[in-house]
Amino acid sequence: MLIIVTYDVSTETRAGRKRLRRVAKLCESIGQRVQKSVFECRINLMQYEELERRLLSEIDEQEDNLRLYRLTEPAELHVKEYGNFKAIDFEGPLTI
């Protein structure tokens, strides 16, 4: 499944800046950054539930905003892409 993760973490305080770094690092570990606070993640249901749990443990619900969107498959029918962005093909072979 394709998940879109968006967040807006308050950075008014040192704790907020730490939360922002932790949320971004967590998203980077499982998905691909497409904008500053937007990630695309191709994951299964178990990974989705774990990601949601971990993200909710990081944010401050009084200060921050987190949105998780599950796109209907096939995602290619629901996502239109314009401009200069080079997506990584997670389904294809990995060259190191």
UniProtKB/Swiss-Prot annotation:
Record-listed Mg(2+) binding positions: D8
Listed EC numbers: 3.1.-.-
Co-factor requirement: Mg(2+)
Pfam family, one: CRISPR_Cas2
Enzyme class, UniProt record, top EC level: hydrolase
Keywords: Antiviral defense, Endonuclease, Hydrolase, Magnesium, Metal-binding, Nuclease
Keyword Cytoplasm among UniProt keywords: no
GO biological process: defense response to virus; maintenance of CRISPR repeat elements
GO molecular function: metal ion binding; RNA endonuclease activity
Superkingdom, taxonomy of origin: Bacteria
Quaternary structure note: Homodimer, forms a heterotetramer with a Cas1 homodimer.
Alphabetical list of PANTHER family matching this protein: CRISPR-ASSOCIATED ENDORIBONUCLEASE CAS2, CRISPR-ASSOCIATED ENDORIBONUCLEASE CAS2 3
Chain's role: CRISPR (clustered regularly interspaced short palindromic repeat), is an adaptive immune system that provides protection against mobile genetic elements (viruses, transposable elements and conjugative plasmids). CRISPR clusters contain sequences complementary to antecedent mobile elements and target invading nucleic acids. CRISPR clusters are transcribed and processed into CRISPR RNA (crRNA). Involved in the integration of spacer DNA into the CRISPR cassette. Functions as a ssRNA-specific endoribonuclease.
Family as reported in the entry's similarity comment: Belongs to the CRISPR-associated endoribonuclease Cas2 protein family.
Protein name per Swiss-Prot or TrEMBL: CRISPR-associated endoribonuclease Cas2 3
Protein's organism: Nitrosomonas europaea (strain ATCC 19718 / CIP 103999 / KCTC 2705 / NBRC 14298)
Gene name for this UniProt entry: cas23
